[in-house]
């Protein structure tokens, strides 16, 4: 086991979108971009032991540009702020993405806990989504391009939520 770390030192182009773009371009330049898909997580996420299997089962079942998962809260009961965030992500999963998946319409990725198709990364030449809300930018781009984002309700990640307003901004 082990990990390969790609260090990036760019103080002008900051943010997750630029970091993902840099990583995918490094993988491509070194000939390591032959994967079916790539998972995107935040460093503080806890990934359910069945996550990869469930996402893979859904990914294999259709031609998806990306898949999103159920984003649960690690600290739902900490206070009303963290609980509010937890309820927001529950609403997003159960009342937006789950029904859309059942109806065969487009879902949306949201921040963390998603799988993006290697084919899409290769077509785009990396991750050209650099807005602060790069997840929304990607989701809209998929809709414009006629690419489908799916949802896997059995794949769960646990994400730590802010406990005060300063953290949430």
Predicted segment positions?
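A short, conserved beta-strand element in the Rossmann-like catalytic core
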Residues: 14, 45-47, 72-75, 137, ...
């Amino acid at each position: 086991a082990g990990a390969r770390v790609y260090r990036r030192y760019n103080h002008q182009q900051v943010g997750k979108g630029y970091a993902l773009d840099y990583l995918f371009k490094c993988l491509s330049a070194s000939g390591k971009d032959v994967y079916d898909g790539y998972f995107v997580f935040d460093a503080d996420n806890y990934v359910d032991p069945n996550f990869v299997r469930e996402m893979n089962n859904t990914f294999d079942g259709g031609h998806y540009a990306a898949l999103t998962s159920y984003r649960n809260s690690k600290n739902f009961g900490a206070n009303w702020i963290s609980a509010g965030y937890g309820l927001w992500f529950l609403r997003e999963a159960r009342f937006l993405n789950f029904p859309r998946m059942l109806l065969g319409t487009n879902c949306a990725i949201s921040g963390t806990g998603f799988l993006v198709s290697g084919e899409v990364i290769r077509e785009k030449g990396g991750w050209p989504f650099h807005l602060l809300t790069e997840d929304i930018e990607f989701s809209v781009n998929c809709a414009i391009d006629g690419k489908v984002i799916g949802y896997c309700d059995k794949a769960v990640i646990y994400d730590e939520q802010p406990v005060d307003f300063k953290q949430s901004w």
